[in-house]
Regions:
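Alpha4 helix (beta4-alpha4-beta5 surface) of REC/receiver domains from two-component response regulators
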Residues: 65, 79, 90-110, 119, ...
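Short hydrophobic/Thr-rich beta-strand motif most characteristic of the beta2 strand and flanking loop
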Residues: 28-35, 43, 112
């Protein structure tokens, strides 16, 4: 799989989507984009990505709802989809805060803080891609 892995980036901010696309494509990844959770669920079926990079706070359907939807039997095929959450909250606080606020355990692989540092993002994406390549 390696660098040819396909990554679905979901963020309502077009500038953030473009920045993430540039960072990921410069490292050799294939990038598909969606602007909200509803579009994300459609793209999952169409594109069959290897990894989902998901903003939590979006209009129409947010990241919380996407994580919850992936537990639904209709999306059982994607239940083990690796997810990196984009968060503007400090990483050490994010997981506890979001679990408390939503009452739903977010089963995600990692968190990346906004503003995004490309080296941090690429390191975390690389770790997940290597892990899933071994599965």
């Amino acid at each position: 799989m390696g660098k040819s892995a396909k990554i679905l980036v979901v963020d309502d901010d077009p500038d953030m989507r473009e920045a993430l696309q540039m960072i990921l494509e410069s490292a050799g990844y294939t990038v598909v984009m969606a602007e909200d959770g509803k579009q994300c669920l459609s793209k999952l079926k169409e594109e069959q990505p290897d990894l989902l990079i998901l903003d939590l706070l979006m209009p129409r359907m947010d990241g919380f709802e996407v994580c919850k939807a992936l537990k639904d039997p209709r999306y059982a095929k994607y239940a083990r989809m690796p997810i990196i959450i984009l968060s503007s909250v400090q990483e050490g606080v994010s997981h506890r805060r979001y679990e408390l606020e939503t009452g739903v355990r977010l089963d995600v692989d990692d968190y990346v803080e906004k503003p995004i540092e490309s080296s941090v993002l690429l390191e975390r994406v690389g770790k997940i891609i290597k892990r899933i390549a071994k599965e």
